[in-house]
Each structure stands twice: as C-alpha cells, then as structure tokens.
Amino acid sequence: MTDKIAVLLGGTSAEREVSLNSGAAVLAGLREGGIDAYPVDPKEVDVTQLKSMGFQKVFIALHGRGGEDGTLQGMLELMGLPYTGSGVMASALSMDKLRSKLLWQGAGLPVAPWVALTRVEFEKGLSDKQLAEISALGLPVIVKPSREGSSVGMSKVVAENALQDALRLAFQHDEEVLIEKWLSGPEFTVAILGEEILPSVRIQPSGTFYDYEAKYLSDETQYFCPAGLEASQEANLQALVLKAWTTLGCKGWGRIDVMLDSDGQFYLLEANTSPGMTSHSLVPMAARQAGMSFSQLVVRILELAD
C-alpha cells in the first residue's frame, strides 16, 4: 500500500498566492510520478488532524511564516509525521536573515555589511551611533524585513531622504529590519537536493533589483542556467553554498541566494528552505539542467523526507 501524502499549500503568510501556485505544481508532479497526493490548505484545514486524516508523509509547499519558519516543522515532529525539507532549528534560522548572517559571519563566510534595527529603536528615534553606522554603508542600500520572504517589504534606497519610508514599509512586516550595503554585481541562486548541489542560476531582473514583481509577475526577468561562470568560479560558488547550508544545519532541499559584487567576491544573501515551485521558479530550472524532470524532482524531494 502506497503512502498517502499531504501537500501543504496556501497558508496564511504574505506569500500565500505564491504557495498556492507552488503547491498546485508540486501536486501535479507527484501525481505524475505515481504518488497518492492530496492538497491541504492550513488556512482551511486543521493541520493537527493530518494523521487522523490518514496521511503518512507531508510535502511542505508553504512559504514564509507558519510554513517555513520551524513552527509547522515542530508540530509535525510532535505528531510523528515525516516532512520534506529542513528541521525546526534550520528552518527558523533560515527564515531569520539577521541570525543567518550572524552565523555565517561567525563561520568566516562572506556577507554584505549591514545594520540591524528593531521597531522599538526606530520608533524612539535612531541614535547618532546608529545613524553613523547606516551612513557608513553608503548609498544605495537595501532595506528588508528580517523574517519575510519573496522580497516582501523590501526596498532599494538611493537617497538618504527615502530611508524613513523604506524602514516604515519594512517594519509593517517584521519587528526587526536589516539595512544592507548595496552589492552591484549579478545575483545567483544555487539549489541543493540531498547531497547534490545543482548548477547555479544567474538572475537578471528587468528592474534595478530582484523584487516580488521580478520574481513572480514579470516575464522580462531573465534566468541563465548554466550561469556562465568559469569552472573555477562555479566550483568556488558551490563550495561556499555548501558551507552556508551546513552552517545553518539545513537538509533535504532548498536554495541559497548569492551576489557577486564588482570586487569579484561572492556574498551570501539568504537561505530558502521551502523555495518557490512555480513556472518562474529556480530549483526546477536547475534540476532540468541536471537532467531531472519536474516530476522526478518533486518525487526525489519527497524521498528525502524524514
């Protein structure tokens, strides 16, 4: 008798719409691979009842809070249900850009200079020291919520007088916000599948940076896989990504986003432990380059669930 698989999709985070698309694609791919899979939306179904509903395994196609941040993973562990992707701690750390950066920095891995602010600090007014630290980053900077995905709440700030509005927007989505030095080179993403590192993808957005619209709505964003790196650069990138992945304790599948700055140095941006699986998504693109169909990819991700 084959396992009955729940594909968790939708949910209640800011990335609900993306997750619905991801989940629908995953569901179709699993069924194509002969898997007995069913959609479950935590917004509409009590996921504490998954076991009593007869499910033996869970494919997490949720993005953002409540699906990618360790809370759901902890619940599934208490229920004794195997699930795809990283465990509780690695999921929580990867969702938190600030703590990811602190860990990577502590491990000697390259990250862009940044300043972190809390909502309380912002509301009471920034100190001279904080203002000096922000000023030292130069312009432009990227302002982003620490625990939000899909570039939700993110802004590029090119003038000092635009910083307050960018911070206000970011603080609508989180209690902690990062202000990062702008890196001028191309962005890459590298997918990991079990023990295998897939070919890197180079991202060329039509606008000034890879925001929500460029990720999910624009047909003008260009993706290159292979990424066009020299063999030695690709090897360096893969080695960096593997170190970043293991430092956070990630497993199963996911991807890590990286920038190549004008100085020729790769800088780690963030880890994604439940990446998008839509028509614009990058893990399926990398898997295709490695000779794997979408259906084979999702079946393999499910096989890695524990």
Swiss-Prot record:
Its cofactor is Mg(2+); Mn(2+). One of its GO terms (molecular function) is metal ion binding. Residues 101-303 form the ATP-grasp domain. The active site is at residues 15, 150, 281. GO terms for biological process: cell wall organization; peptidoglycan biosynthetic process; regulation of cell shape. The lineage of its organism: Bacteria, Pseudomonadati, Pseudomonadota, Gammaproteobacteria, Enterobacterales. Its EC number is 6.3.2.4. Belongs to the D-alanine--D-alanine ligase family. InterPro entries: ATP-grasp, ATP_grasp_subdomain_1, D-Ala_lig_Van_CS, D_ala_D_ala, Dala_Dala_lig_C, Dala_Dala_lig_N, PreATP-grasp_dom_sf. This is D-alanine--D-alanine ligase B. It is found in: Cytoplasm. The keyword Iron-sulfur does not apply. Pfam families: Dala_Dala_lig_C (PF07478), Dala_Dala_lig_N (PF01820). It catalyses: 2 D-alanine + ATP = D-alanyl-D-alanine + ADP + phosphate + H(+). Mg(2+) 2 binds at residues 270, 272. It comes from Escherichia coli O157:H7. Pathway: Cell wall biogenesis; peptidoglycan biosynthesis. The gene is ddlB.
